[in-house]
Amino acid sequence: MFGKGGMGNLMKQAQMMQEKMAKMQEEIARMEVTGESGAGLVKVTMTGTHNVRKVEIDPSLLEDDKELLEDLVAAACNDAARRVEENQKTKMAEVTGGMQLPPGMKMPF
């Protein structure tokens, strides 16, 4: 069915892919991105595992209304999360050689 050495090669490829995935997961966990809102007045730094590391708020916003500040912090968090997702997709494409996964399917499985 797999031919001479076909199954062995397939297993080797699967193992190499698994090793690349583990390395990619470690890189993503160490990665940090910064999301911004209000033209950089609010910045949120987040890890590749979506943990917020730091929130920076321009002092001028502390004098404005509370609701505006809350909206800007939420927007910066969402921007950081979007950037994490983009970086994860880029890393995944490096590992899978650009192979597209079906919609909704996330790796590692």
Curated annotation (Swiss-Prot):
This protein's record includes keyword DNA-binding: yes
SUPFAM superfamilies per record: YbaB-like
Main location class: cytoplasm
Assigned keywords, A-Z: Cytoplasm, DNA-binding
Pfam families: YbaB_DNA_bd
Subunit structure comment from the entry: Homodimer.
Designated name of the protein: Nucleoid-associated protein Sama_1311
